[in-house]
Regions:
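C-terminal beta-signal and adjacent terminal beta-strands/loops
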Residues: 619, 777-784, 803-865
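Short, acidic, small-residue-rich periplasmic hinge/interaction motif at the N-terminus
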Residues: 27-43, 130-188, 196, 231, ...
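Gram-negative outer-membrane beta-barrel transporters
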Residues: 486-489, 558, 562, 666-684, ...
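Extracytoplasmic beta-strand/coil segments of soluble accessory domains associated
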Residues: 179, 196-243
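Outer-membrane beta-barrel translocator/receptor signature
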Residues: 231, 247-252, 261-270, 275-350, ...
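Membrane-embedded beta-barrel scaffold of Gram-negative outer-membrane proteins
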Residues: 427-431, 437-455, 604, 608-616, ...
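Face-selective signature of the C-terminal outer-membrane beta-barrel domain
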Residues: 363-364, 369, 418-578, 602-604
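Structural signature of Gram-negative outer-membrane beta-barrels, strongest in the C-terminal barrel
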Residues: 359, 478, 493-501, 505-507, ...
Length: 865
């Protein structure tokens, strides 16, 4: 998969003396004599080049361009500055600048001595006949030219031409107005003090920490509280992250194993319109494309004394020749947080990815990742027990000698957990011939989580009368393996370019899952022969997911494109009990299958204007245990027999119309409306070991997004800005809920807004300044179904950062929550009973929350090489 990118050196000027001037060249590349006293000046010669990424929108429209550039080459042959002198627009200028600043040259020489020179270049982009996103009918690839040194017609042009590979894994083509892609360069301008914050580069996605420590993030998008991943599919290089039938919750997606600096790109879709996305993709998908090389190596140290925050990350991109690309990294992290009871959260991450070019048509990549962490966590606090939180003062009997808790306190300081993850991955890519491409991925991973949550008070928290409290231990240990194979064919029918993709995905999870009642992390198995005869659950789960898909893309006219697809999925799951004394005796097999059609139409009246219409059917799976739960123990009223709403695959349908305009280079504005119907939701609640069958739901709303990206004449000059607003309306649509007025969707976001601006500005040859400001806002939302729902309080948070770099050294600071807002980051409706509150009557439901970060100063120092 290659393209032809000629690089033309049009002229050069030797710097450093008043007499220096452009020198005409001979056919051998030597300066032509201009007189008897002419100096012997040798022009710079290109030594190594870097590959330019073809701008995806330009490649889609088969645009070609030539970008005029002027670069300064120092005495060592390095490019120390570059600017565009002949702009082409459509993203070509930025791509050419990014590539040319990585070039190296044999330096120009005067009388044999290396000297600094200015070189004028022409970087040409030619749309390849076989580009990743090209629908044009295939044609014979041009023969690759060798390195050329030629005399121009005016005896003053040195032309250097090379063949350059197309970066495999270029950004996907945009098939919906809501699709987005964020490059590594833009990611480098954004604050990255936590891994889950990478999700927030996706327009409309909010990610919060709702218990502290290393527990997975809680995410929101388009009217969905997707908790840890129930309705958004997450991938790392095509490896699915959402955990099926997880001990803590369905779709559990912990991103703490990702080192932010190793992410090369973040791609995202909304809705169910992509045929290659299956389980959990009802609201959309987010894919982290990991880097196999980085522009620079870096060692970065972060400190936030008020949080007890320390983070050290080292990323190295070693050079093993032109056929290898490699990146390795390690991260050491420790944090106590603002809490009275320190989180003591420590983790260690390691990462390595390498790509080997096998020949002109194929390459293979390998990746390994490792993560280990342990922590304490604050958990959630009943608002009525917290000073100044607006839900009233606790009853005098609530606490002895204290009327209320600090928002930084904990109802159970023994909460916490530990987690490990190890993953190995390989991917093979080959251009089989001029029509067919193959991509095959194989992966295997092991993950383990031991979590001790207590969503309330350690003593008599649950409303069911249990005397031993509500802390539980959730253990999930799994081996997961799978493959993803895709075959793509490009051709034409009746003169219409077509692209056909067929694929198969297999995933098998072998899981050991346990759930125990605990107190202070001590298991209570058997302490009460009637109510707690043993573990709540102790069993083995084997779950196999099989997916096949086909997608056809056809372009009957330059301004019209259709994408239609179909996907078939099947789930086969077994659960077996491992403890005769377990509260839940779960044994059995369940299987289910679904066929999901997809359809998209894209109309482009102008090159700068696209109209989209999308339809798709999809699903999210439910915990296999919820198909069988039936507790014989009367003292656990939360347990119930399987409900008719219990389905292994909850079907969904999605619709979207939208438009995208690009009025000027670098600026993209989008507007879209969406509707999502979900047939039913049935997920296991890992905190209470009960099932929660829910009827059908519907969400609809609108989304507005804007993004601007600018690269100046100096490639170190960079500016980005983005804005996103989403309004969503979601309700249960079951007739019984409508009649009872209990149609509100708990925790579902109603309105969200985010905006940010950041940039990098060189102020001299050696100095560069950069900074950013972001604002994120979530409106009030409902805490329960109603009919008079509790309200979860909204919030608005502003963060800012600034930094300065001198040559290879950088210093910077970020201020998180500039206004020091006392905000509730994670919120839930919980029925709880505080210590010393009467056992009867059962307290009314209330909001429990995890406090968000206070104003925090975070500093960093970095060294680049």
């Amino acid at each position: 998969m290659r393209r032809l990118v000629p690089i033309s050196i049009a002229a050069f000027v030797v710097l450093g003396s008043p007499a220096a001037s452009a020198q005409p060249t001979t056919t051998e590349g030597q300066p032509a004599p201009s007189g008897p006293q002419a100096e012997a000046v040798t022009p710079p010669v290109l030594r190594t080049r870097a590959e330019a990424t073809y701008p995806p929108d330009a490649l889609r429209d088969r645009l070609e361009a030539t970008v005029g550039l002027e670069v300064i080459v120092d005495e060592t042959g390095a490019v120390v500055d570059a600017r565009v002198v002949g702009p082409a627009g459509h993203g070509f200028d930025e791509a050419a600048l990014e590539a040319v600043r990585k070039f190296t040259f044999e330096p120009a020489r005067r009388n044999g001595t290396p000297v600094r020179s200015t070189v004028q270049l022409a970087y040409e982009f030619h749309a390849p006949p076989r580009a990743t996103m090209d629908l044009a009918p295939p044609s014979a690839a041009p023969a690759p030219p060798s390195l050329l040194v030629q005399q121009g017609p005016d005896q003053s042009t040195l032309v250097v031409a090379e063949r350059s590979t197309v970066p495999i894994g270029a950004p996907p083509e945009r098939n919906a107005a809501s699709d987005s892609s964020t490059s590594q360069d833009e990611l480098s301008l954004r604050p990255r003090y936590r891994a889950e914050g990478l999700l927030e580069v996706v327009p409309g996605v909010f990610s919060v920490q709702h218990a502290g420590g290393g527990k997975a993030q809680q995410d929101f998008v388009r009217g969905f509280n997707i908790d840890h991943g129930t309705d958004m599919a997450f991938f790392v290089d095509d490896v699915p992250i959402n955990a099926v039938s997880h001990a803590h919750g369905q779709g559990f997606s912990d991103l703490h194993f990702v080192i932010p600096e190793t992410v090369g790109r973040v791609d995202s879709t909304k809705g169910m319109y992509a045929a290659h996305v299956g389980d959990f993709g009802t609201a959309g998908s987010t894919s982290f494309v990991m880097a196999d090389h980085t522009p620079e190596s870096i060692a970065r140290l972060e400190l936030a004394p008020s949080m007890g925050h320390e983070r050290l990350v080292v990323v190295e991109s070693p050079d093993f020749g032109s056929k290898w690309r490699m990146a390795v990294a390690t991260e050491v992290f420790y944090e106590n947080g603002p809490f009275i009871h320190p989180e003591n959260y420590g983790r260690l991450n390691a990462y390595a990815k390498a790509t080997r070019v096998l020949d002109e048509r194929s390459e293979i990549s390998f990746m390994a990742m490792a993560y280990g962490g342990s922590w304490n966590m604050s958990g959630v606090l009943p608002a009525r027990a917290v000073c100044g939180e607006g839900d009233g003062t606790p009853r005098p009997s609530a606490y002895s000698g204290s009327n209320c808790l600090s928002r930084w306190d904990s109802v159970d300081p023994t909460q916490g957990g530990a987690s490990q993850r190890f993953m190995a991955w390989t991917e093979y890519r080959r251009q089989l011939d001029e029509h067919w491409d193959l991509k095959a991925t194989l992966y295997s991973l092991y993950s383990n989580l031991q979590l001790f949550p207590n969503d309330g008070i350690a003593a008599s928290f649950q409303p069911d009368g249990m005397q031993y409290g509500s802390q539980v231990e959730q253990d999930d240990s799994r081996n997961e393996s799978g493959t993803d194979v895709r075959l793509t064919h490009r051709g034409a029918l009746g003169g219409m370019p077509m692209r056909t993709t067929i694929g198969m995905q297999l995933r098998n999870d072998v899981i050991e899952s346990q759930l125990h009642r605990t107190e202070g992390r001590v298991r209570l198995d058997g302490i009460d022969p009637v109510n707690i005869p043993g573990p709540i659950f102790d069993g083995h789960i084997n779950e196999l997911e099989t997916g096949v898909f086909a997608e056809e893309e056809v372009k009957p006219a330059r301004w019209l494109r259709f994408v239609v697809g179909v996907r078939g999925d099947r789930i086969d799951a077994n659960v077996s009990n491992e403890s005769p004394t377990a509260v839940y005796q779960l044994d059995g097999y369940k299987g289910a299958a679904q066929l999901s059609p997809k359809a998209t139409a894209i109309v482009s009246p102008l090159d700068e204007w696209d109209l989209f219409a999308n339809y798709g059917r999809g699903f999210h799976s439910n915990d296999i245990r919820s198909m069988f739960i039936n507790s014989p123990i009367a003292a656990l009223p939360s347990a119930q027999a399987p409900s008719s709403a219990g389905v292994l695959m909850a079907a969904a349908s999605g619709y979207e119309v939208g438009t995208t305009v690009r009025p000027v280079d670098g600026l993209s504005l989008s507007a879209m409306a969406f509707l999502i119907d979900l047939t039913s939701e049935l997920v296991i609640d890992g905190d209470t070991a009960s099932t929660a069958p829910a009827g059908p739901t519907q969400r609809y709303g609108a989304e507005l997004t804007g993004r601007y990206s600018f690269v100046g004449r100096n490639p170190r000059q960079r500016l980005y800005a983005d804005v996103s607003f989403t309004a969503a309306h979601g309700r249960f649509t079951d007739a019984a809920d409508v009649a009872a007025g209990t149609t509100y969707l708990p925790d579902a976001p109603i309105r969200t807004f985010s905006a940010g601006i950041g940039g990098r500005q060189p102020v001299s040859r050696d100095w560069t300044l950069q900074g950013d400001v972001t604002v994120r806002s979530m409106s009030d939302r409902y805490g329960d179904q109603g009919p008079t729902p509790l309200i979860e309080t909204g919030w608005t948070i502003v963060n800012a950062g600034i930094g300065a770099r001198w040559k290879f050294l950088e210093l910077g600071a970020d201020v998180i929550n500039i206004a020091d807002v006392a905000w509730r980051e994670g919120q839930f409706e919980v029925q709880s009973r505080l210590p010393k509150e009467p056992v009867s009557p059962v307290p009314q439901p209330g909001i429990s929350f995890t406090p968000g970060m206070p104003r925090t100063l975070m500093t960093h120092a970095a060294v680049y090489w």
